[in-house]
């Protein structure tokens, strides 16, 4: 009986630790390609967000100003997939991150560069 209680406490601890670490894990986004020739698109993918929830995408221009915040909806796995149109973008490096208001978390900041010169893609 004593061993059963100890086992129950251990199992409860492991489950609680797993639940806490799953809740505190920050969402992650990636962009592809990281350097793109204007006017071709950039693909953004994200994981680790609250499932079936609204998230807020932020995109900062090379001059430090931000585009209008874009609201997106995650799938049942907490994933997002979005194509970024570069047609109105000037050359330079852009910063992208996504907020998850429900979980009160923010993704990493991903960067991509828009260029008008095809030679820049060879570097």
Residue ranges of model-derived segments:
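Hydrophobic h-region of N-terminal signal peptides that target proteins for export
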Residues: 12-20
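Extracytoplasmic/secretory-pathway segments with low complexity and glycosylation-like composition
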Residues: 20-123
């Amino acid at each position: 009986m004593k061993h059963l209680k100890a086992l129950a406490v251990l199992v409860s601890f492991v489950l609680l630790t797993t639940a806490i670490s799953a809740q505190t894990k920050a969402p992650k986004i990636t962009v592809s390609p990281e350097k793109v020739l204007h006017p071709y698109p950039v693909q953004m993918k994200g994981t680790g967000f609250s499932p079936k929830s609204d998230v807020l995408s932020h995109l900062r221009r090379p001059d430090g100003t931000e585009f209008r915040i874009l609201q997106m909806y995650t799938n049942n796995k907490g994933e997002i997939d979005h194509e970024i149109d570069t047609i109105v973008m000037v050359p330079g490096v852009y910063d992208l991150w996504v907020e998850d208001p429900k979980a009160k978390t923010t993704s990493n900041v991903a960067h991509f560069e828009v260029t008008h010169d095809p030679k820049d893609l060879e570097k």
